[in-house]
């Protein structure tokens, strides 16, 4: 312990004498010393080992100039000429050249050069070479920048996997992703449930039906010249199977109209005498290809409320809601029914 203190005290004494007595260094401040990384000293390159060291030459020339005895004091060209394998207990970090048996000038030079001259030690551990990893400018006087070993490096594509922790191969944001996936599953189940309700209560596409929150005010049934007589004789209106769920909204007293697409005329005014349903009369509108089955099973009983002249298309089509070209919606809203009743009243005083 006493030996190390004496060695360190000897070094600092020599350093003080060097600063005061050397003519070219007498005016240097502390910030301009060789131990500082101050950039005011323009010619000095801080520990630029990688840029100035030759693999075949262990000497380090920080000024890239030829050193002679005439300019050694002006350039302070620090060189190391020690052995590559000279590992002693000198001043400086482990692995630096021993300074026990050196004179004061060599003691001052040796720790500065040999401490950072890693290229003289030929060590290669798992592909890591100290000489190749040393950053010459010592990262502006802080630490050397060692090689980054990417644990998750894709050597084939030369890309790192994104969004994954390099040390543990863990997908980042896992909880968030699981939560989003659960929400998506819940939404999908809810949509399936709603679709099931739609299939149960409504078979018509949205364009052909009233909005759910709108009250049905009336209904238009369709016929042709062949079926119109049967409709009036049986006092029973019918529609194809796809309207079975739709006509269930019909209640007794609801205004009804009968459209003949053979003549393109709207007949009225009729009134529902029963609730809408399926196959109220199974033998009505019998299908010749399938005996015992009705071609128009969506049915409702109807009575004549008022005998009126039929309306032409030009008078009633502007009132109705159209979709897919000339097609119009059979479910009528309350304003549509009131408008149709007004037109019938005007043409039949």
Curated annotation (Swiss-Prot):
Induction: Induced by touch and salt stress. Induced by wounding, calcium, magnesium and methyl jasmonate. Induced by osmotic stress, cycloheximide and ozone. Induced by abscisic acid (ABA).
Gene Ontology process terms (BP): cellular response to hypoxia; regulation of protein catabolic process in the vacuole; response to endoplasmic reticulum stress; response to salt
Quaternary structure, from the entry: Interacts with CRY2 in the cytoplasm. Interacts with Verticillium dahliae PevD1. Interacts with FYPP3.
InterPro entries in the record: Dev_and_cell_death_domain (IPR013989), NRP-like (IPR044832)
Free-text tissue specificity from the UniProt record: Highly expressed in sensecent leaves, cauline leaves and sepals. Expressed in the shoot apical meristem, leaf veins, central cylinder, root hair zone, root tips, rosette leaves, flowers and siliques.
Keywords: Cytoplasm, Stress response
Chief location: cytoplasm
Region annotation (Disordered) ranges: 157-201
Entry annotated with the keyword Phosphoprotein: no
Domain DCD: residue ranges: 214-346
Phenotypic effect of disruption: Reduced length of primary root and increased sensitivity to salt stress.
PANTHER family: DCD DOMAIN-CONTAINING PROTEIN NRP (PTHR46034:SF37), PTHR46034
Pfam families registered for this protein in UniProt: Dev_Cell_Death
Places the protein is found: Cytoplasm
Keyword Disulfide bond: no
GO CC terms in record: cytoplasm
Domain of life: Eukaryota
Protein's UniProt name: DCD domain-containing protein NRP
UniProt function note: Contributes to the initial phase of responses to abiotic and biotic stress signals. Binds FYPP3 and facilitates FYPP3 degradation to promote abscisic acid (ABA) response.
